[in-house]
Amino acid sequence: MKKTHITEQNFADLGLQPQVIDGLNAKGFIKCTPIQAKALPVLLAGQDIAGQAQTGTGKTLAFLTATFNHLLTTPAPEGRKITQPRAIIMAPTRELAIQIFNDAESLIASTGLKAALAYGGERYEKQQQVIEQGVDILIGTTGRIIDFYKQGHIDFKMIQAVVLDEADRMFDLGFIKDIRFIFRRMPAPTERLNMLFSATLSYRVQELAFEHMQEPEHVVVEPEQKTGHRIKEELFYPSNDHKMALLQTLIEEEWPDRAIIFANTKHKCESVWGHLAADKHRVGLLTGDVPQKKRERILEEFTQGNVDILVATDVAARGLHIPQVTHVFNFDLPNEAEDYVHRIGRTGRAGASGNSISFACEEYAINLPAIEEYIEHSIPQSDYDASALLEDLPAPLRLQRRPQQNRRNNNGQRQGGNRKHSRPRQPRNTQS
């Protein structure tokens, strides 16, 4: 039987509160994805869960639905102040925290529960003002949440529901001490509903679950394969001298509607951005030190189609809901095998097809065996003709001289680049 990304389970048949159903209907959510169909009955019965599912499977909606429903069906603690949150949702990055908040908007509107954001990179006072107006659900990153706690603006004494999203990423980013700090200041695990979600349920993630949860049930949705079957994978072995020219040649051959290019370092991302921007592509840059407001604007432009290509470090690879990405380019093979899956999982989502093109260059080809062992298959290899690569490419822009990019001419047509002509290129020879 062929698996699909939607089940026959209706949200309306799960016994959810009418206000929650209204919020789901407002966004067109009628039937559950597999992780929702498995997790929600467990959570609605009051049982903690440690859920495992790939990015893009609907786990965010699963824990939001359970959280809002739990607060509607559970009386608020006696003596609670409006600045004492009843639920807390922790995410590894501010982008993911913002995305979770945006996904919750229809439930906020339909239930009347108040939510607030807490993350670094934005004015402390602005977030504080929202919290002081009352907060039922606090969504954010651990560092800023702890800042508010230490300043006395919030406490965790009235917490009735907890979500830890992307738990494995929390470990990778070194946030485990912050997580334990917050957990240890909450009511006992038996007095709250606890939800942990992770792409992998490694030993350290399971250890965290059993330390701070009440006998969580494991809910696992295994994919047919670690990389989506709708994603066409392709691998090249370029020399370091050919990498950038090969990337630009492939972009003009593939002409992706919406692409993400991943590199392993901020410096490399800036270099790739500079070459593509000079060639008049509509390209955005997303790295860890880009100011928060600018990051939000870049993501919005990419989502709305005003930017065609996003060059990013792994900060964009986990948790963000960026629809209709047609291509993912691994300019550098990631150092961690799991990150390969998370990167290419940006495409081929919600039943759509996608394309993943990876470079095994002189520097990062050493990572390929571990990646192929992890995904349990070899990535199909393709050759390229070095003499057919684009040569008349403009010098890269420097980041501080970033101009306004426009990838369309006055007639509204997309431009092919900044060259007087393009060299004819031979078709690639794909090997199985």
From Swiss-Prot:
Biased composition (Basic residues): 417-426
Motif window: DEAD box: 165-168
Compartment annotation: Cytoplasm
GO CC list: cytosol
Main location: cytoplasm
Single Gene Ontology MF annotation: ATP binding
CDD domains: DEADc, SF2_C_DEAD
Chain spans, region Disordered: 397-432
Gene3D superfamilies: P-loop containing nucleotide triphosphate hydrolases (3.40.50.300)
Listed GO biological process terms: RNA catabolic process
Enzyme class: hydrolase
Domain (Helicase ATP-binding): residue spans on this chain: 40-219
Keywords, ordered alphabetically: ATP-binding, Cytoplasm, Helicase, Hydrolase, Nucleotide-binding, RNA-binding
Record InterPro entries: DEAD/DEAH_box_helicase_dom, DEAD_box_RNA_helicase, Helicase_ATP-bd, Helicase_C-like, P-loop_NTPase, RNA-helicase_DEAD-box_CS, RNA_helicase_ATP-dep_RhlB, RNA_helicase_DEAD_Q_motif
Ranges where the Helicase C-terminal domain occurs: 245-390
Function: DEAD-box RNA helicase involved in RNA degradation. Has RNA-dependent ATPase activity and unwinds double-stranded RNA.
Subunit structure: Component of the RNA degradosome, which is a multiprotein complex involved in RNA processing and mRNA degradation.
Family: Belongs to the DEAD box helicase family. RhlB subfamily.
Protein name as annotated: ATP-dependent RNA helicase RhlB
